[in-house]
UniProtKB/Swiss-Prot annotation:
Record's function text: Epithelial cell-specific Ca(2+)-regulated actin-modifying protein that modulates the reorganization of microvillar actin filaments. Plays a role in the actin nucleation, actin filament bundle assembly, actin filament capping and severing. Binds phosphatidylinositol 4,5-bisphosphate (PIP2) and lysophosphatidic acid (LPA); binds LPA with higher affinity than PIP2. Binding to LPA increases its phosphorylation by SRC and inhibits all actin-modifying activities. Binding to PIP2 inhibits actin-capping and -severing activities but enhances actin-bundling activity.
InterPro entries, sorted: ADF-H/Gelsolin-like_dom_sf, Gelsolin-like_dom, Gelsolin-like_dom_sf, Villin/Gelsolin, Villin_headpiece, Villin_headpiece_dom_sf
Notes concerning its domains: Consists of a large core fragment in the N-terminal portion and a small headpiece (HP) in the C-terminal portion. The core fragment is necessary for both actin-nucleating and -severing activities, whereas the HP binds F-actin strongly in both the presence and absence of calcium and is necessary in actin-bundling activity. The Gelsolin-like 1 repeat is necessary for the actin-capping activity. The entire core fragment is necessary for the actin-severing activity.
Superkingdom of the source species: Eukaryota
Organism: Bos taurus (Bovine)
Record's protein name: Villin-1
Any one of the GO BP annotations: cellular response to hepatocyte growth factor stimulus
Molecular function terms, GO-annotated: actin filament binding; calcium ion binding; cysteine-type endopeptidase inhibitor activity involved in apoptotic process; lysophosphatidic acid binding; phosphatidylinositol-4,5-bisphosphate binding; protein homodimerization activity
Gelsolin-like repeat intervals: 27-76, 148-188, 265-309, 407-457, 528-568, 631-672
LPA/PIP2-binding site 1: annotated segments: 112-119
UniProt subunit comment: Monomer. Homodimer; homodimerization is necessary for actin-bundling. Associates with F-actin; phosphorylation at tyrosine residues decreases the association with F-actin. Interacts (phosphorylated at C-terminus tyrosine phosphorylation sites) with PLCG1 (via the SH2 domains). Interacts (phosphorylated form) with PLCG1; the interaction is enhanced by hepatocyte growth factor (HGF).
This protein's encoding gene: VIL1
Keyword Ligase: no
Region (LPA/PIP2-binding site 3): 816-824
Length: 827
């Protein structure tokens, strides 16, 4: 019987973020060494556990991977072990079924350098990767722009096509052949994979050569080797288009209720997109079908034990019934331990008894009471995580310039109107703050709900012009009326006023209302604003403070549920609304004139406001593209700064605001389409997102701490020393002389390339550095080849002795190698 062994339980990591992998061997879980992570056999099945840390919370994912040539018994064992591991973790894990060739983005994300799938398996005597083994011949087909998967294919030109990257691995030589229609990123990923094989599997003692398919004549010696090994070159196949998933398909959600209460399993459709969390009952199990792309099974914590146990089988039966491909991805979600991806398929997802971060943006009627927090502005940059959570780059004490869109042009706003935002206008506000005496800029684009479409368009256009005047350094923040972020409010020190309509233009003929009512929200100078509402009694709320301005007086109405801090901030902002003396009115003690000004008494919200819902917000990073003529967003799991490519644009979704990051070498069309791209993302989001979500445009090299704080260990100097594809290619020594290797390989038949040849000789025994440096031949330890002393060193000693890595050394011309060995006492 398949059962999780005590040895596996004892070695199971449950506290430290990271990955563990086991291979199914003779129906048992056998650990895979870390230097073999990312290498899989198509005849085997594997179990992978990943632990992630978000804040102080740990989350668990368990995947079982099915090789296309694996046996049914091995597949069944992997599935059972996955369930048992989840049981051992007390139901805290998300379970994933992965099938070769259709792995999830989450799975691929664990292997940033790429995945290599090899032929064979444990049944045919195949072992995991052995370091320094050169008895290898294989052709790898590299697929994928970001997290690549390289599978072994037939060693023949027939396997090639014009659009992909291929690695011909011959032990001590790896040739990367780039299809003439492959793109820059595919070539870079292929090169990184080739270097990974060289450094991890061969200890750096392998040459890597690159052939660009559009210019094969530039690499005659490498092409001679390829033709010798692969046979005579024939016409190449056309490029094969990558599979594109339509966003609409991702948003096509259907929820099914699963029950076996009648003695047989009954699956019944109960809802379609948009979905809400209250559709899920703790007593039952459910299947969520995402357009046939992925199947989720949600297991209620109080559901029937048998239903829980059969969850995976129910999903597989569902796939068969729907005639979906057998490789369809499956995820099992435990009640209370749902993944962020699953949660965001719903309109909103809340978790009881979990505190939330500060500084969410809200509209009137759903505004949360924000606890006052004292912070030092400089700490926002020392601790960007705090800045990201609070959405504050500083305390709002920087320099301010403000313009209004008038006749589609920028007109400076009179000083007396700073902090006043009229719903019939659009404004640009440039905020300047300094870090170590260097200026940084935020460009707010505030768009009134009653502004014309021409003015809204002009505000975006003028923002681009202003951005260019400041060398494209400002961070652009689109702010729809009612979505004002905390930092914008902090600039006006508790005196920000938002009017329903109207304008602050000097020549305006629009009449000013004789009676105005403002709802005040906020507890400090950093989070307070007054928002105009309809002047009638029904607009009141017992939890808040309101300002009622009439022609004769100004009332400050204090609801029974408001706090002392809220009353004090309301008094401050009331002076901005009206210069007249304020009459404080306590709820229940209103004078007759108060109700008269509001058109008479009427029912209003008087129940105690519920505590703010604990929305679960997990930041998600997406690579964006519109190169195919339609918007595509590819998620990057477990993201870090390295995932931000200079040639691309990315979208960072933190739910109540969305960042759009632009790499310095990004496509011009993608740069210009920032707002459109984010809007398209929000429209096609299966969670039914608010299209008025604030959009923040960030350029590479000018990231504010509110952005960098979502990344672990952000390095502001990372791109100063980054290397291009051309730089990496030059490092490989492709301009060198390949004649010796060419002669070695082409002097014998392809099948003779093995560890017995000079080129592919196996690893030599390792000795301490001090036993090899500056020693005459007779004093060398037994077994040392005097002419190859450097090959008897560990990688660490090699690097210390020669001042470079083995891979860099082997890329040097032979004469340079010899001179360096003489200089370092290894000749």
């Amino acid at each position: 019987m398949t059962k999780l062994s005590a040895q596996v339980k004892g070695s199971l990591n449950i506290t430290t973020p990271g990955v563990q992998i086991w291979r199914i061997e003779a129906m048992q879980m056998v650990p895979v060494p870390s230097n073999s992570f990312g290498s899989f056999f198509d005849g085997d099945c594997y179990v992978i556990q990943a632990i992630h840390k978000t804040g102080s919370n740990l989350s668990y994912d368990i995947h079982y991977w099915i090789g296309q040539a694996s046996s049914q018994d091995e597949q069944g064992a992997a599935a059972i072990y996955t369930t048992q591991m989840d049981d051992f973790l007390k139901g805290r894990a998300v379970q994933h079924r992965e099938v070769q060739g259709n792995e999830s983005d989450t799975f691929r994300g664990y292997f940033k350098k790429g995945i290599v799938i090899r032929k064979g398996g444990v049944a045919s005597g195949m072992k995991q990767v052995e370091t320094n083994s050169y008895d290898i011949q294989r052709l790898l087909h590299v697929k994928g722009k970001r997290n690549v998967v390289a599978g072994e294919v037939e060693m023949s030109w027939k396997s090639f096509n014009r659009g992909d990257v291929f690695l011909l691995d011959l032990g001590k030589l790896i040739i990367q052949w780039n299809g003439p229609e492959s793109n820059h990123m595919e070539r870079l990923r292929g090169m990184n994979l080739a270097k990974e094989i060289r450094d991890q599997e061969r200890g750096g003692r392998t040459y890597v050569g690159v052939v660009d398919g559009e210019d094969e004549k530039a690499s005659p010696q490498l092409m001679e080797i390829m033709n010798h090994v692969l046979g005579q070159r024939k016409e190449l196949k056309a490029a094969v288009a990558d599979t594109v998933v339509e966003p609409a398909l991702k948003a096509a959600l259907k929820l099914y209720h699963v029950s076996d209460s009648e003695g047989k399993v009954v699956v019944r459709e109960i809802a379609t997109q948009p979905l809400t969390q209250d559709l899920l009952s703790h007593e039952d199990c459910y299947i969520l079908d995402q357009g046939g792309l992925k199947i989720y099974v949600w297991k209620g914590k109080n559901a029937n034990a048998q239903e829980k146990k059969e969850a995976m089988n129910q999903a597989l039966n569902f796939i068969k019934a729907k005639q979906y491909p057998p490789s369809t991805q499956v995820e099992l979600q435990n009640d209370g331990a749902e993944s962020a991806v699953f949660q965001q398929l719903f309109q909103k997802w809340t978790v009881p008894n979990r505190t939330t971060g500060l500084g969410k943006t809200h509209t009137v009627g759903s505004v949360a009471k924000v606890e006052q927090v004292k912070f030092d502005a400089m700490s926002m940059h020392v601790q960007p995580q705090v800045a990201a959570q609070q959405k504050m780059v500083d305390d709002g004490s920087g320099e301010v310039q403000m313009w209004r869109i008038e006749n589609l042009e920028l007109v400076p706003v009179n000083t007396k109107w700073l902090g006043h935002f009229f719903g019939g206008d659009c404004y640009l506000l440039l905020y300047t703050y300094f870090i170590n005496e260097k200026p940084h800029y935020l460009l707010y684009i505030w768009q009134g709900s009653q502004a014309s479409q021409d003015e809204i368009t002009a505000s975006a256009y003028q923002a681009v012009i202003l951005d260019q005047e400041y060398n494209n350094e400002p961070v652009q923040i689109r702010v729809p009326m009612g979505k004002e972020p905390p930092h914008l409010m902090s600039i006006f020190k508790g005196c920000m006023v938002v009017y329903q309509g109207g304008t602050s233009r000097a020549n305006s003929v629009e009449p000013v209302p004789s009676t105005r009512l403002f709802q005040v929200r906020g507890t400090s100078a950093n989070n307070t604003k007054a928002f105009e509402v309809s002047p009638r009694a029904a607009s009141l709320n017992s939890n808040d403070v309101f300002i009622l301005k009439t022609q004769s007086c100004c009332y400050l109405w204090c609801g029974k549920g408001c706090s002392g801090d809220e009353r004090e901030m309301a008094k401050m902002v009331a002076d901005t609304v009206s210069r007249t003396e304020k009459q404080v009115v306590v709820e229940g003690q209103e004078p007759a004139n108060f109700w008269l000004a509001l058109g008479g008494k009427a029912p209003y919200a008087s129940t105690k406001r519920l505590q703010e819902e604990n929305l679960v917000i997990t930041p998600r990073l997406f690579e964006c593209s519109n190169q195919t003529g339609r918007f595509l967003a590819t998620e990057i799991p477990d993201f870090n700064q390295d995932d931000l490519e200079e040639d691309d644009v990315f979208l960072l979704d933190v739910w109540d605001q969305v960042f759009f990051w632009i790499g310095k070498n990004a496509n011009e069309d993608e740069k210009k389409a920032a707002a459109t791209t984010v809007q398209e993302y929000l429209k096609t989001h299966p969670g039914g997102r608010d299209l008025e979500t604030p959009i923040i445009v960030v350029k590479q090299g000018h990231e504010p701490p509110t952005f960098t704080g979502w990344f672990l260990a952000w390095d502001p100097f990372k791109w100063n020393n980054s290397k291009s594809y051309e730089d990496l290619k030059a490092e490989l020594g492709n301009s060198g002389d390949w004649s010796q290797i060419t002669a070695e390989l082409t002097s014998s038949k392809p099948e003779a390339f093995n560890a017995n040849s000079n080129l592919s000789s196996g690893p030599l025994p390792i000795f301490p550095l001090e036993q090899l440096v500056n020693k005459p031949t007779e004093e060398l330890p037994e077994g040392v080849d005097p002419s190859r002393r450097e090959e008897h060193l560990s990688i660490e000693d090699f690097t210390r002795a020669l001042g470079m890595t083995p891979s860099a050394f082997w890329a040097l011309p032979r004469w340079k190698q010899q001179n360096l060995k003489k200089e370092k006492g290894l000749f």
